[in-house]
Amino acid sequence: MASVESRIIAITGGASGIGAATCRLLAERGAAVLCVCDISPKNFDDLKISIKKINPSTKVHCATVDVTSSVEVRQWIEGIISDFGDLHGAVNAAGIAQGAGMRNTPTIAEEVDEEWTRIMNTNLNGVFYCTREEVRAMKGLPATDRSIVNVGSIASVSHMPDVYAYGTSKGACAYFTTCVAADAFPLGIRINNVSPGVTNTPMLPQFAPMAKTFEEIEESYKKEGLSLIEAEDVARTIVWLLSEDSRPVFGANINVGACMP
C-alpha cells in the first residue's frame, strides 16, 4: 500500500471530485498536511469534516484560489512554504469541462473564442502556473523524493470531435508534463500526468448537457464505448505517484479507465 505518511501535499481543485477523493485517500494513508485550494469555498467545511473522520491527525488548510491567476497561485504556494516549511508533493486537479452534443456538424464552425480561451486558461495555463510555482518552491528545499501529479483526461488521446478546447487543453497538459518532467527530474522532483476516463464527479453532467438523468449520461457514454469510473479509482493512481513506491516513474501519462481508441 502506497504510503504518504508525514508528507505535506498541495491539491488544486481539492474541494470536489477527483481532488476531494485524493484528499480523503491521502489522509487515510497518513499525510500530515493537506493544503487544498479551490475557486469556490462552498465545499471546504464538508471536506474538513470528512478528513477529520478519516484521520484526525491530518491537518487541512483550505484557500480560495483562481488557478488562472499566476499571482494567486504564487501567493498560495509561497504561503504553504511560509506556514509549513516544506512541500513534498502536489496534485493539480483543477479543471473545467466542455459540453458536447449541442452543436451542428461541423462542430468546429461553432467553436467560439470565449469558450476556447476560458478552457485553456484553466486547464492549461492553470497547470502551467501551478507546476511552475511548485517546482520553484521544491527546488529550494532539502533533497528528498518530491512528486507533482497533473490531472489530464483520456480526451487527450481519444478522438472526440465536439470537445475541441477541452481535448486540446488536456493533450497540451500531457505534453507539458513530459517536458517539464525531464527538466525537473535532476532536482529530485518527479512529475507525471494522470488521464482519467469518464469519471463520476460533479463535473460529469457538464459533458452531457442533453441528458436529464445519471442513467442517461451513463448510457450515452456506453454507446460511445466509454466506461464510467469513480473518483476513488483515479485517486489511488495519484496517491501511488505521490508515494515513494513510484520513485522510478517520471514523465509518464497514465490512463485510468477504459475508452474508445
Curated annotation (Swiss-Prot):
Species this protein is from: Aspergillus fumigatus (strain ATCC MYA-4609 / CBS 101355 / FGSC A1100 / Af293) (Neosartorya fumigata)
Similarity section: Belongs to the short-chain dehydrogenases/reductases (SDR) family.
Keyword Protein biosynthesis carried by entry: no
EC top class named in words: oxidoreductase
Domain of life, source organism: Eukaryota
CDD domains, A to Z: SDR_c
Pfam families according to UniProt: adh_short
Keywords, in A-Z order: Alkaloid metabolism, NADP, Oxidoreductase
The protein's name: Chanoclavine-I dehydrogenase easD
GO molecular function, one term: oxidoreductase activity
Residues at the active site: 166, 170
Gene3D superfamilies: NAD(P)-binding Rossmann-like Domain
